[in-house]
Amino acid sequence: MKNKFLICDECQAVNLKSLKRKLEKLDPEAEIEIGCQSYCGPGRRKTFAFVNNRPLAALTEEELMEKVTKQLKKPRDPEEEERLRKRNEERKRRKEEQDRKLKEKLKKRKAEK
């Protein structure tokens, strides 16, 4: 089973360019998905990545890469990964819904002016 990394291109603490390079070097065969991961709170203060649907965060990229390496050495449980995948998808769906409602509200206020 291929490893999967999810990294954010919007969070302040994530340096997308260097993190992506390090993850590719660690596992060239892994699938890397770039985009908002709806993990904004921790993403303001810590660099993070989802490794096989499990969130990992650290204050520095070096610390994060140590955690990623440890996580990749652990045995994988397909049922647990599926549960985590569903949880992540639900979190993303809720964030998109909140964003949509906020845009509608702002659009409505603008129209009232």
Swiss-Prot record:
Compositionally biased residues, Basic residues: 103-113
Bias type Basic and acidic residues, positions: 68-102
Domain of life from the UniProt record: Bacteria
Keywords: Coiled coil
Signal sequence region: none
Coiled coil: 78-113
Chain spans, region Disordered: 68-113
Pfam families named among the record's database cross-references: DUF1450
Family per record: Belongs to the UPF0741 family.
HAMAP family: UPF0741
Protein's recorded name: UPF0741 protein SE_0364
Organism classification: Bacteria, Bacillati, Bacillota, Bacilli, Bacillales
